Amino acid sequence: MPRSFLVRKPSDPNRKPNYSELQDSNPEFTFQQPYDQAHLLAAIPPPEILNPTASLPMLIWDSVLAPQAQPIAWASLRLQESPRVAELTSLSDEDSGKGSQPPSPPSPAPSSFSSTSVSSLEAEAYAAFPGLGQVPKQLAQLSEAKDLQARKAFNCKYCNKEYLSLGALKMHIRSHTLPCVCGTCGKAFSRPWLLQGHVRTHTGEKPFSCPHCSRAFADRSNLRAHLQTHSDVKKYQCQACARTFSRMSLLHKHQESGCSGCPR
């Protein structure tokens, strides 16, 4: 340890310490070289300090508990283990490798969490939290309600049709009630766009015209059907005369006209 740590700091901050005086005033920190045997013997502490139990009186623990604490009888443990060792070593060389069955696997240790302990823990949890038992019941009721709603069918009161959604049933009921009525002729329709196409037949408006010819139509669906007549692909064929048509309606009209098997 440096000697600067052993110096006492002066009280006056302006005063500078004199280290030479401090060395003369503390002669016990100076040792003579080389050390002789007398100095070494004086530095060794007495036996009372090295072994305090020899000089201190017996404590309460030593007088009361120490006689009860006896060393472990290792010999008795060895004697208890010796029959097992003798039993294992008593097998002869013939039995050790011929006709001996393999040792059975060790039985599993009994689980500390048995069914009774689990049930008791659940009972304690339900007793501590009364609302805990209602949560599974509420979930079960919600699942049952969803299943009933999924299985529930909406029946039409005008016919025997059934629908899984209420919106689909309402759209179907419009086909019975026909709420869209024409103001000119009184004809009713289930959809407003159907009524709009019908009104054009009274006004003569035909906003949908064919780009290939001069024909025009009041409804877009009629224009779409007319465009198939301009197509090169005619997939509807008459089996009697092998004529092809672009629309199924034209094929039916051809068959109703009395096809004799030859083109006219």
UniProtKB/Swiss-Prot annotation:
Tissue: Expressed in a variety of tissues with the highest expression in kidney. Expressed in mesenchymal and epithelial cell lines.
UniProt PTM: Phosphorylated by GSK3B. Once phosphorylated, it becomes a target for ubiquitination by BTRC, the ECS(SPSB3) or the SCF(FBXO11) complexes. Phosphorylation by CSNK1E, probably at Ser-104, provides the priming site for the subsequent phosphorylation by GSK3B, probably at Ser-100 and Ser-96. Phosphorylation by PAK1 may modulate its transcriptional activity by promoting increased accumulation in the nucleus. Phosphorylation at Ser-11 and Ser-92 positively regulates its functions in induction of EMT and cell survival, respectively.
Induction line: Induced by TPA maximally by 2.5-fold at 4 hours, in HepG2 cells (at protein level).
Effect of R3A: Loss of interaction with KDM1A
Phenotypic consequence of K137R: Lower sensitivity to FBXL14-triggered degradation. Lower sensitivity to FBXL14-triggered degradation. Complete loss of sensitivity to FBXL14- and BTRC-triggered degradation and loss of ability to repress E-cadherin
Effect of S119E: Predominantly localized to the cytoplasm
Outcome (variant: T203E): Exclusively localizes to the cytoplasm. Reduces capacity to associate with nuclear pore importins. Unable to enter the nucleus. Does not abrogate function
Superkingdom field: Eukaryota
Keyword S-adenosyl-L-methionine: no
Places the protein is found: Nucleus; Cytoplasm
Gene Ontology biological process: aortic valve morphogenesis; canonical Wnt signaling pathway; cartilage morphogenesis; epithelial cell migration; epithelial to mesenchymal transition; epithelial to mesenchymal transition involved in endocardial cushion formation; hair follicle morphogenesis; heterochromatin organization
Effect recorded for K170E: Does not affect binding to KPNB1, KPNA2, IPO7 or TNPO1. No change in subcellular localization
Consequence when changing S107A: Lower sensitivity to BTRC-triggered degradation, impaired phosphorylation by GSK3B and loss of cytoplasmic localization
Glycosylation sites: S112
Effect of S100A: Lower sensitivity to BTRC-triggered degradation and impaired phosphorylation by GSK3B. Lower sensitivity to BTRC-triggered degradation, impaired phosphorylation by GSK3B and loss of cytoplasmic localization
Effect of F5A: Loss of interaction with KDM1A
Name of the featured protein: Zinc finger protein SNAI1
Organism (species): Homo sapiens (Human)
